[in-house]
């Protein structure tokens, strides 16, 4: 499982150094290839390549006659790129994806089970503050019987 939050700095070339705790797991379980894509304007998704393939298949299976779904396919699949982790555990994030999501220097790498989300660190702090301010009664209604 991929979990935890790491605040990292991109180097001057736009490379992200995957933290050692994740690098070892990724290399042993999934190999050195990752797939990065855009899901929204505020963050990127970063999948180990084997975890991306079923997501890609589900996206390709969506009905293409629906204009909204077609736009979503175009957004996610059209921006998907395979990255190779170098010997130092770094991946080069495509410049266009960095621009679209305002990833410049400080970023938050957020483990989400089968993938990472990659946020501008300031935006991540804002998202975290918003999450902490969620109305607990409203959240309980949505969670039903689920507890931690």
Curated annotation (Swiss-Prot):
One of its GO terms (biological process) is negative regulation of DNA-templated transcription initiation. InterPro entries: MraZ (IPR003444), MraZ_C (IPR035644), MraZ_dom (IPR020603), MraZ_N (IPR035642), MraZ_sf (IPR038619), SpoVT-AbrB_dom (IPR007159), SpoVT-AbrB_sf (IPR037914). It comes from the Bacteria. Keywords: Cytoplasm, DNA-binding, Repeat, Transcription, Transcription regulation. GO terms for molecular function: DNA-binding transcription factor activity; transcription cis-regulatory region binding. Residues 5-51, 80-123 form the SpoVT-AbrB domain. It holds the Pfam family MraZ. It is found in: Cytoplasm, Nucleoid. One of its GO terms (cellular component) is nucleoid. Belongs to the MraZ family. HAMAP family: MraZ. Forms oligomers. PANTHER family: TRANSCRIPTIONAL REGULATOR MRAZ (PTHR34701:SF1). This is Transcriptional regulator MraZ.
């Amino acid at each position: 499982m991929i979990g935890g939050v790491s605040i990292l700095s991109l180097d001057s070339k736009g490379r992200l150094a995957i933290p050692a705790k994740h690098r070892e797991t990724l290399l042993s379980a999934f190999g050195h290839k990752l797939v990065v894509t855009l899901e929204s304007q505020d963050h990127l998704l970063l999948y180990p390549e084997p975890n991306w393939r079923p997501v890609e298949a589900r996206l390709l299976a969506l009905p293409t006659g629906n204009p909204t779904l077609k736009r979503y396919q175009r957004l996610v699949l059209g921006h998907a790129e395979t990255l190779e982790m170098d010997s130092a555990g770094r991946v080069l994030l495509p410049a266009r994806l960095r621009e679209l999501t305002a990833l410049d220097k400080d970023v938050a790498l957020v483990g989400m089970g089968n993938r990472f989300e990659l946020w501008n660190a300031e935006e991540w702090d804002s998202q975290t503050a918003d999450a902490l301010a969620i109305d607990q009664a409203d959240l309980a209604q949505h969670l039903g019987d689920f507890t931690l």
